[in-house]
Amino acid sequence: MQTLIHRGMAALHQDDFAGLYTLWSGTSALDHLQEADLALLMQRCDARIQAAPGDAGPWWVKCLIYLDRSAHFNSNREQALRTVADWAGRAIGLAPDKAEAHRLLGSAHYWLDEHAAAIGAYRNAQALQPQVDLQVRLFEMESLPAGQSPQLLQLDFRDGNACHYYGAGVSIGKWKRAGLDPADAGYVDAVQFALYEHCTTLFRQGLELGDAATCNTDTHTFAMCCNNLGILYMDRGLYAQARAILEEGLRHSQFQFLYQNLREAYRHQGMRAEAADLALTLMMDYELDTPLFLDCAQAACSHLNRVGRHADVLEIAEAAQEAFEALPDDAQADPELLRMYALVQAHHRLTAARALGRLQPQQVDTALSRAAAEANPHDLDTLFVHASALGEAREYPAAVDAYTTLIAQAAQQQDAQALKRARHGRGYLLLYYLPDAKAALQDFLAVQRDGTDDFYTYYYQANCHYVLKDYRSALPACDAARALLDDAMLQADPGSAAQLYMMEANCHMNLGAYPASLAAFERSLALHERADVRESYELARQLAAKPKKRLFGLFS
């Protein structure tokens, strides 16, 4: 944008008002000028009119200033637009064969809702120079009110001004509405897509030329076009293309909606880290409404917990609490807001606090998780948050009941991953806290039958058999879990791997297979040196070293 402004100022220095108009028309350049600069620019226009009364350029620039920033000069918008119409008429008198003044006259009447006058002026401008955004406006004023189908719109793409294609795309997008004929809606969507794509092509060409470009190269408008095109790509399920065009836009200008849509594209492509980074950017750099803030907060917290930034999660949770508690009571009861807030406070915050050793059962807000679950009885994530919160609060029977509700709902919705998570959660509580290892085993066997098993499925199966002293059944489960151990798993959770090997070793020892027991103990101790495991290992060594007693001592 600064480059575009500097190029415009260079044209002004040369008294090239027509060149300045060409550079800044259709851009947001004037929006970036201070009020003092606007006043100075208007003075320069007036001085040029006095010095060169036959030059239409300064009249074009005056019209452009009033169309975009009239509030600085006249608080009455209607009067300002009448002034634009007067100035445009003078410019037409000086250069009737130039499309610019006819366009400006048409725009003054368009914003005054004087469509008949606007149509006449726009038609004159279009006859002198094809302008794709005017073609859309003409169809909008003439054909749509007459009930004609949008499919009758035929555009002339000889216009070389990239900003016109962006403006046309925005205008035609307003034609989309509920109840629009599907064929008409499809046509409008296709035309809008073509307009934005051509806009980006022209912008790229202009940016490659740099200072040699004769058209405007407003990078902010380019970024806005990339944003809108990205939305259309996502509407088509083309998330890789959406990501690429949104990232391209972000290289030229940064604004909230561009970040939001790029974050959405990242989420659809499973790029959690990148989406979380943008969520943090949005929360830090922009004033977000509470729903968006909570959505960003829950996504960011999920990723930050995953990468070990637990203290940051607690900070975000505190900010989310302030935002939520500032809402009126009726807003706090909104199911969607409750869902997101509970995810932050009753799940991510607890995960972070537990990782930092700060979690106290009495700190768990089960009332919040219960309210969220009651408001969202079919949302599987919310039901899981409530069940896990009850577990953290050590309300184990209630937590098992909540997991049972979740299992039924997940089965009804045929969500295999939610079903696995719920069965793991309930089985874990039954195994370690109630305890009921036999019932817990049924949950882990069910996960295996569903085909969603992983290391922990077999690890918990082995633990259930071990607790039930069914060592022969525990060993195949240990083998299955060990087969799923890889370097990443060992690095992420060496404690569980060590515990698995310890169970395997004890099973072998209880069955009298001392050499196998020794090997398993050594694997366990290599991951985690524990005094009790070391003691068992030494015992296994002693037992392995003793000669086996034969029947009746005949071969001893």
Residues covered by each model-derived region:
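"A position-specific structural signal for the A-helix of alpha-solenoid helical repeats
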Residues: H6, V61, L104, R137, ...
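Residue-level recognition of tetratricopeptide repeat
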Residues: M9, L64, A71, S107, ...
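TPR-repeat structural position
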Residues: F17, E35-L38, L81, H115, ...
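Single-residue signature of alpha-solenoid repeat helices
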Residues: L20, L41, V84, A118, ...
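Short coil/turn linking the two alpha-helices of tandem helical-hairpin repeats
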Residues: S28-H32, C63, D68-S75, W111-D113, ...
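Hydrophobic/aromatic packing residues within the alpha-helices of TPR/SEL1-like helical repeat arrays
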Residues: C45, L81, A88, Y122, ...
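Short coil turns that delineate tetratricopeptide repeat
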Residues: P53, P96, P130, F157-G160, ...
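Start-of-helix register in tetratricopeptide repeats
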Residues: G57, E100, D133-Q135, N161-C163, ...
